Amino acid sequence: MSERIRVRYAPSPTGYLHIGNARTALFNYLFAKHYDGDFVVRIEDTDSKRNLEDGESSQFDNLKWLGLDWDESIDKDKGYGPYRQSERGDIYNPLIQQLLDEDKAYKCYMTEEELEKEREDQIARGEMPRYGGQHAHLTEEERQQFEAEGRRPSIRFRVPQDQTYTFNDMVKGEISFDSNNIGDWVIVKKDGIPTYNFAVAIDDYYMGISDVIRGDDHVSNTPKQLMIYEAFGWEAPRFGHMSLIVNEERKKLSKRDGQILQFIEQYRDLGYLPEALFNFITLLGWSPEGEEEIFSKEEFIKIFDEKRLSKSPAMFDRQKLAWVNNQYMKTKDTDTVFELALPHLIKANLIPESPSEDDKEWGRKLVALYQKEMSYAGEIVPLSEMFFHEMPELGEEEQEVINGEQVPELMTHLYGKLEALEPFEAADIKKTIKEVQKETGIKGKQLFMPIRVAVTGQMHGPELPNTIEVLGKDKVLSRLKKFV
């Protein structure tokens, strides 16, 4: 593209970084970086009553964790600030006055009760609810009368009639709206704060935003924003609206959906890797060419093509996320995965709160056993249950294995050799099992399966010698003794 690409992610600090918002930020970031453009983070904080104390800092912290490095924001002013909407009143106020002076906006003194009554009557008549324009042409005398009654006005934009607003959406194609279906809408609330659709259009223009990429739920906001651009004689940015994210039942992803964790913070807490979430979220509504699904951030930037954004809803597949994270887990060194797993082991009282070096070394060996199968670091706790609790009651299949004819002989030989073994390490344990094989003539499944069942209570699991080392000599001998 010949012009400089500038995109923005504009969260509200009324909440934490949600999967849907993370996807919006991520697609904007990839689009900007692909075209060597600017990724701007702007804070839409005018809803002061709902703002969370740590909402803003949480947004930035989680964006940074995901690897989304912004070019401009509250900490990097490149001349387009302020980057908080609440600090941009000096920009909005003259423009509001200009619209009033040009009769493109007017003061409306209707009360909430009057507006609600109008809405109810329209619905009862089967009409689409919209403001009827009762205060669109007040006389000065009428305005003064309302002021004297103590009514505080909102300011409404005067919607042009019989006009079609059309834009070419980069995802959905051409979309049109009839202005006659849109009532005169509020641009400034009674408390003097500009509304979203007014402020966002002003901000995008003054910040030189070239492309607005956002969720499907913003399509209906676009004609109102186009009206603002038209009223000031400005060129509008290009728009792209991403498809919905749906759950596995194909229903819109809702914050009330208890089946799916909704916030990036929750995945961090469970021990997911940022690269894996970056990868997984990028594939929610966008697809690369070919079959490959695992890419680095740099590879995604290189191959990102907005033409491959999907019109169809993107399904949040939990199994797919587990698979993607597991692919990244396998590539990490054990120390990295152990550091992610350590808080979970401590929380479950499986490792002391202030672990010694010996505790940590044991923990690393435990993590190494399961690293290739872990979906996330916190999964180490349920996976390694056998190391910390009494053996579960054996199932029918396990009973059949442990009741084999050669098992007593096998266990007697193994017990004696392991009891004398020092140091109790995987390499020596492996040799010991081979010695037992030679001495007894028992081999293959008849050798390994009874040993595994005897010490773990399970038919399958990680490398047997390593498992025995991590279980520890005392626990292994105690469990073997039952079958000698």
UniProtKB/Swiss-Prot annotation:
- Give the transmembrane region(s): none
| Stretches assigned to coiled coil | none
> Does the record bear Cytoplasm in its keywords?
yes
GO process terms (BP): glutamyl-tRNA aminoacylation
> Highest taxon of the source?
Bacteria
This protein's assembly is summarised as:
Monomer.
What is this protein identified as? Glutamate--tRNA ligase
> Single GO cellular component annotation?
cytosol
Compartments annotated for it: namely: Cytoplasm
Q: Where is this motif: 'KMSKS' region?
A: 252-256
Give the protein's biological function. Answer: Catalyzes the attachment of glutamate to tRNA(Glu) in a two-step reaction: glutamate is first activated by ATP to form Glu-AMP and then transferred to the acceptor end of tRNA(Glu).
Q: Please verify whether the record's keywords include ATP-binding.
A: yes
This chain is encoded by the gene named gltX
Q: Where is this motif: 'HIGH' region?
A: 11-21
Catalyses: tRNA(Glu) + L-glutamate + ATP = L-glutamyl-tRNA(Glu) + AMP + diphosphate
| Principal localisation | cytoplasm
PANTHER family, sorted: GLUTAMATE--TRNA LIGASE, GLUTAMATE--TRNA LIGASE, MITOCHONDRIAL-RELATED
Keywords of the record, alphabetical order, are: Aminoacyl-tRNA synthetase, ATP-binding, Cytoplasm, Ligase, Nucleotide-binding, Protein biosynthesis
GO MF annotation terms: ATP binding; glutamate-tRNA ligase activity; tRNA binding; zinc ion binding
Q: Which family does it belong to?
A: Belongs to the class-I aminoacyl-tRNA synthetase family. Glutamate--tRNA ligase type 1 subfamily.
Organism annotation = Staphylococcus haemolyticus (strain JCSC1435)
A Pfam family name for this chain? Anticodon_2
Q: What is its EC number?
A: 6.1.1.17
- Annotated residues that bind ATP are located at K255
- What CDD domains does the annotation carry? GluRS_core
